[in-house]
Amino acid sequence: MAGHVSEAVIRRLPGYYRHLRELEAAGVTQISSQELGERMHQTSSQIRQDINCFGGFGRQGYGYNVSELKEHIGEILGLRQKHSVIILGAGSIGTAVARYPTFSREGFETIAMFDIAPEKVGTELCGVPVLPMDALEDFLREHPVDIAVLALPARVAQETLNRLDLCGITAVWNFAPTDLTHPEHMIVVNVHLSDSLQILSYRMAHRGETEH
């Protein structure tokens, strides 16, 4: 596998994996870079360049074996490993993440949720216990956790991230509407839901304009 891969390539990998999974489910066994590019609205050369970053998986005159390429990309994405997950915040976003079925199929197991609301603490969401926020440190001392999902208001997100850092958590999926300051050893992926909506709004406002 290549040592350095650009952020742009990394961001495209989940799309490849998703489309290949759909093709496999539809019974498609092989696909060319041109066909995959048309499906993903990318050029065939871009497809080949991205995939070649990790080795040659295609064959001249044949293209790609759909199942094999899906498995290779899944391995590159780390999807062969099991990851234990906690969700901080049992509101709308936290609950939606807990209920999303694909995560468990891809090896992401939510083992606990945390919240401050008395009416939520002590209940279960999708079979996952909701614990009080002040039990976070004790829980992390007793349970190995790979990923923490922050589904909290911006005003408490940084403080909570700092608590996670002190507990040894090094991977955070942040849905709080703010970018967080974090140490270099911690991987934080920010998901700003409004960004996608604003991009959609821009494209609607400029529909039909020719790019120069």
What are these regions (language model features)?
Residues M1-T29:
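Extreme N-terminal segment that seeds HTH/winged-HTH DNA-binding domains in transcriptional regulators
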Residues R21-E24, C126-H212:
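Phosphate-bearing ligand-interacting subdomains
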Residues Q30, Q34, R39-K82:
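HTH-adjacent hinge/linker in prokaryotic transcriptional regulators
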Residues A90:
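Glycine-rich Rossmann-fold phosphate-binding loop(s) that bind the pyrophosphate
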Residues I93:
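Hydrophobic/small residue at the entry helix of a nucleotide-binding pocket
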Residues R105-C126:
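NAD(P)-binding Rossmann-fold cofactor-contacting core
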